[in-house]
């Protein structure tokens, strides 16, 4: 029945790049690429290129690969070394491209575990968990209307039908033409949802893209609602790594890159690019250089703007487009090691609604092996609190204190815990998607076929987001290099490209 419904509704993965069987797998001529940025986008590009015979140098400014999925060690007061990360990341099952990269280190993805659920909690309303909804659209939407106390069938009488229809009519061209000049807040106002539904269904979802509703494109919100819910045949279930991201993801990927012959250099920031007779030269502050025929740049918007400003020989339209890129509101992450655990029935991960600062809670000692071992040895707990769109100017220490206080209002037993150690940070490098930004947003291609861009901020002709958008743009950049060298493209798959009611 499920297979029949998927066929009738067109709810199945769709190929957006199909390799030509008459092209060779490996490049026909010797060629090279320098990849600037060792996050998901850059590593995805480097991995595919190296597999196909391209000589690759990968340059990463930080001391570890990973970008915003990076992990790094800290020493706790008891002398134990723990790994901390940028924040919780869910590996959704429609992340087809990112998962295809990860299958190169484990075809069975055995290092991923299903997250049992992820309720949205608040002080105002009972917790609500959406992970158990049926996977298949629109059955998932019907089940939501039947099951959810936040949005009941009778509430639909007061909802603006035209605004609601936009959620089911996603079309990459029409949706952005109609809604990219509108804020997500304005669209939600038009919808006229009950306050609880707006808070629990939409605001929590929107915050997970690190953008505030008043500065987030309504078209981007609709695209992501399509990608995760209304066009996604895999459902809202997600997986998490069995251990920290460094151990589960980056150590194996780094080892694979080494075996493929990639020259991986961490702690290697690039100051500028220079055009050469045969391609591109990267120049570091100390003067070291790397020459290659192709350059794939997978940096965050701020780092990319800085690189483009310092570089000569770049296409003028690219300079203009990159200058218009923005970052979103700052995000804050705080990880706490405590002397005792929280209640045993607390979920591993919770979204949080309507707190001033706190957006999510993760009990890492019930999620990742390293944190679980520390908790088992000490009797404590490892808890991470995350603010996805914090106020400007908020310090890491203040954010941590606020979020801990807000957690106490949601989980009262927290007041009795003693914090043994905490690690705090504020980041300001997540991409912004403000209204009106789509038309000028850079794509993978720059106007120079030897210079390509990749990242979770890059414009795509189909809906995608976060880790999957980063991996997909990296793969598309690699495909352009492969095409120039006469090799077969790597396949790219995504969700149904258009909404159920798209005309």
Language model segments and positions:
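Mid-domain catalytic core of redox enzymes
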Residues: 2-14, 29, 268-383, 388-394, ...
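Conserved FAD-binding subdomain of flavin-dependent enzymes
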Residues: 77-112
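Helical element adjacent to the flavin cofactor pocket in flavoenzyme catalytic cores
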Residues: 224-284, 290
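Mobile amphipathic helical/loop "lid" adjacent to a hydrophobic cofactor/ligand pocket
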Residues: 98-99, 103-105, 109-218
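Conserved Rossmann-like nucleotide-cofactor binding loop
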Residues: 41, 64, 302
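Glycine-rich FAD pyrophosphate-binding loop
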Residues: 50-75
């Amino acid at each position: 029945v499920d297979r029949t419904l998927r066929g009738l509704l067109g709810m199945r993965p769709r190929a957006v790049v199909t390799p030509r069987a008459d092209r060779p797998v490996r490049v026909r001529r010797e060629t090279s690429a320098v990849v600037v940025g060792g996050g998901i986008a850059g590593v995805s590009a480097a991995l595919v290129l190296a597999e196909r015979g391209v000589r690759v140098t990968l340059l990463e400014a930080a001391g570890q690969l990973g970008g915003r999925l990076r992990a790094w060690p800290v020493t706790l007061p008891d002398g134990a070394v723990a790994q901390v990360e940028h924040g919780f990341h869910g590996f959704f099952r429609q992340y087809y491209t990112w998962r295809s990269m990860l299958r190169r280190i484990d075809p069975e993805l055995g290092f991923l575990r299903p997250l049992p659920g992820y309720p949205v909690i608040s002080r105002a309303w009972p917790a609500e968990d959406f992970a158990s909804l049926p996977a298949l659209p629109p059955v998932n939407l019907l089940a939501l209307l039947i099951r959810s106390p936040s949005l009941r069938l009778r509430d639909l009488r007061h909802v603006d039908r035209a605004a609601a229809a936009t959620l089911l009519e996603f079309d990459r061209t029409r949706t952005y033409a109609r809604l990219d000049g509108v804020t997500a807040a304005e669209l939600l106002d038009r919808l006229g949802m009950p306050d609880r539904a707006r808070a629990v269904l939409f605001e929590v979802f929107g915050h997970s893209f690190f953008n505030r509703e008043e500065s987030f494109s309504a078209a981007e919100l609709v695209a992501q609602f399509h990608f995760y819910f209304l066009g996604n045949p895999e459902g809202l279930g997600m997986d998490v790594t069995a251990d920290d991201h460094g151990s589960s993801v980056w150590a194996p990927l780094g080892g694979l890159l080494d075996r493929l012959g990639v020259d991986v250099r961490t702690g290697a920031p690039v100051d500028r690019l220079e055009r050469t007779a045969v391609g591109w030269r990267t120049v570091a502050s100390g003067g070291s250089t790397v020459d290659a025929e192709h350059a794939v740049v997978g940096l965050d918007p701020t780092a990319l703007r800085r690189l483009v400003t310092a570089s000569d020989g770049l296409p003028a339209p690219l300079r203009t487009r990159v200058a218009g890129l923005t970052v979103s509101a700052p995000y804050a992450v705080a990880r706490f090691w405590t002397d005792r655990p929280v209640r045993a029935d607390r979920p591993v991960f919770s979204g949080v609604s309507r707190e001033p600062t706190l957006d999510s809670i993760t009990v890492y000692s019930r999620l990742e092996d390293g944190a679980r071992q520390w908790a088992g040895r000490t009797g404590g707990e490892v808890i991470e609190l995350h603010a996805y769109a914090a106020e400007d100017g908020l310090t890491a220490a203040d954010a941590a204190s606020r979020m801990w206080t807000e957690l106490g209002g949601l989980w009262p037993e927290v007041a009795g815990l003693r914090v043994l150690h905490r690690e705090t940070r504020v980041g300001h490098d997540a991409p912004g998607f403000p209204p009106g930004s789509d038309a000028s947003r850079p794509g993978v291609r720059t106007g120079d076929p030897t210079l390509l861009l990749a990242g979770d901020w890059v414009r795509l002709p189909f809906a995608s987001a976060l880790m999957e958008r980063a991996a997909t743009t990296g793969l598309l950049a690699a495909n352009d290099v492969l095409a120039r060298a006469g090799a077969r493209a790597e396949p790219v798959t995504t969700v149904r490209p258009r909404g159920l009611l798209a005309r």
